[in-house]
C-alpha cells in the first residue's frame, strides 16, 4: 500500500501586520525587512483565537477536499510549538471538535519541521496497514511567543494553520521517499526562554538551514531514484527568502517552480509548508503526476523532507 496526500486545507487569520506597522513598534524599516527576509506582511490571530481553533478550521477544509469523514479518521497528528495549553493536547481538542471518535491523537513538537515529521509518521502507519486515514495539521500562534520589542525576531513570525489528510493512493502516486533528522547540539541557537519569548542566533540558524535544506532536497531525490530534472516543484519552509533560494538553486529549478508565500505570511513554522501547498494547488502550479519536494528545518535543531508524486 502506498501513502499520499488526499486533501489539504488551511486557515489564515484576518488581521494583517505590515512592515510599516512594525516600523512604529521597533527600530526597523520596510526595506531592511524585505531585503533580509523577503517578508512584507504577516497575519496575526485574534487574542481569543488559539491553535486549536485554527487547526479545526484547516482540518475541516482538508477533510472536505479529501472526501473523508471525520469519523473515518484513525489518527490525528498536530505539529505545533504553541499549543493552547500543556495538556490536553491540541490534537485531542480537535478530535473532540471534529467528532473523530475512533482516532488516536497526539501532538508533535519539531518546530518548523513538524509538519514533515507528521506526514512521515502518518505514512508509516498507513503503509504498514495499521491505519487508513491520518490527519496531519501544522499550526502555530507564534505571535504568542514573540518578543515584540526585539527587532531581530519581531519581524519574522506570523500565525496560521495548514492540514493534510494522508491516506492510501495508487502505486504510481504518493510519497516516494523521505528524510528526517535532528542535531541537538544546535539547540541553543533557537529556543524559547523563561519569558516564553523566541530567542534565535540568526547567523548560526541561517548557516545550518542553507546547508541542511539543500542536502535534504538532494537526498530525497536520490532515495526516490530520481534526478534534479525530474522535480516539478519545490515547497520549502517559508522562513527567509535567501534560505529558500539556496534550496532552489541546489535543485537547479527555475524561480517559477518554487513556492513563495513568505512575503504574505512570514514564518508560520509548522504551518508554512501546508499553507504554501494549498496556495500552489489553488493556483494550478501543481498537477497530477508532478514530483514535488517539500523540505523544512526548525528548532531542535530538526529537519525533514519528502519527495511525493502528486495525485491519488
From Swiss-Prot:
Catalytic residues as annotated in Swiss-Prot or TrEMBL: 112, 237, 267
Record has Magnesium as a keyword: no
Region of interest: ACP-binding: 238-242
Catalyzed reactions per annotation: (2S)-2-methylbutanoyl-CoA + malonyl-[ACP] + H(+) = (4S)-4-methyl-3-oxohexanoyl-[ACP] + CO2 + CoA; 2-methylpropanoyl-CoA + malonyl-[ACP] + H(+) = 4-methyl-3-oxopentanoyl-[ACP] + CO2 + CoA; 3-methylbutanoyl-CoA + malonyl-[ACP] + H(+) = 5-methyl-3-oxohexanoyl-[ACP] + CO2 + CoA; malonyl-[ACP] + acetyl-CoA + H(+) = 3-oxobutanoyl-[ACP] + CO2 + CoA
Domains (record comment): The last Arg residue of the ACP-binding site is essential for the weak association between ACP/AcpP and FabH.
PANTHER family (alphabetical): 3-OXOACYL-[ACYL-CARRIER-PROTEIN] SYNTHASE (PTHR43091), BETA-KETOACYL-[ACYL-CARRIER-PROTEIN] SYNTHASE III, CHLOROPLASTIC (PTHR43091:SF1)
Name recorded for this polypeptide: Beta-ketoacyl-[acyl-carrier-protein] synthase III 1
Gene source species: Bacillus subtilis (strain 168)
Amino acid at each position: 500500500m502506498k501513502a499520499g496526500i488526499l486533501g489539504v486545507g488551511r486557515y489564515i487569520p484576518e488581521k494583517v501586520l505590515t512592515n510599516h506597522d512594525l516600523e512604529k513598534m521597533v527600530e526597523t524599516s520596510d526595506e531592511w525587512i524585505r531585503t533580509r527576509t523577503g517578508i512584507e506582511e504577516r497575519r496575526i490571530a485574534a487574542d481569543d483565537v488559539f491553535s486549536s481553533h485554527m487547526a479545526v478550521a484547516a482540518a475541516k477544509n482538508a477533510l472536505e477536499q479529501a472526501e473523508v469523514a471525520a469519523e473515518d479518521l484513525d489518527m490525528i497528528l498536530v505539529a505545533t510549538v504553541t499549543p493552547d495549553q500543556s495538556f490536553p493536547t491540541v490534537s485531542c481538542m480537535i478530535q473532540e471538535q471534529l467528532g473523530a471518535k475512533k482516532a488516536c491523537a497526539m501532538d508533535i513538537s519539531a518546530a518548523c519541521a513538524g509538519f514533515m515529521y507528521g506526514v512521515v509518521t502518518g505514512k508509516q502507519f498507513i503503509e504498514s496497514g495499521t491505519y487508513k486515514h491520518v490527519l496531519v495539521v501544522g499550526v502555530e500562534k507564534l505571535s504568542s511567543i514573540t518578543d515584540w520589542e526585539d527587532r531581530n525576531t519581531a519581524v519574522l513570525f506570523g500565525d496560521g494553520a495548514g492540514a493534510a489528510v494522508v491516506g492510501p493512493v495508487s502505486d504510481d502516486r504518493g510519497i516516494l521517499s523521505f528524510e528526517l533528522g535532528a542535531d541537538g547540539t544546535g539547540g541553543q541557537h533557537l529556543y524559547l526562554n523563561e519569558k516564553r519569548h523566541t530567542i534565535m542566533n540568526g547567523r548560526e540558524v541561517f548557516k545550518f538551514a542553507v546547508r541542511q535544506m539543500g542536502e535534504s532536497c538532494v537526498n530525497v531525490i536520490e532515495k526516490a531514484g530520481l534526478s534534479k530534472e525530474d522535480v516539478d516543484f519545490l515547497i520549502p519552509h517559508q522562513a527567509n527568502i535567501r534560505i529558500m533560494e539556496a534550496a532552489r538553486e541546489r535543485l537547479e529549478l527555475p524561480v517559477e517552480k518554487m513556492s513563495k508565500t513568505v512575503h504574505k505570511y512570514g514564518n508560520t513554522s509548522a504551518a508554512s509548508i501546508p499553507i504554501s501547498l494549498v496556495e500552489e494547488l489553488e493556483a494550478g502550479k501543481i498537477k497530477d503526476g508532478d514530483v514535488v519536494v517539500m523540505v523544512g528545518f526548525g528548532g531542535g535543531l530538526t529537519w525533514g523532507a519528502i519527495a511525493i508524486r502528486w495525485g491519488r
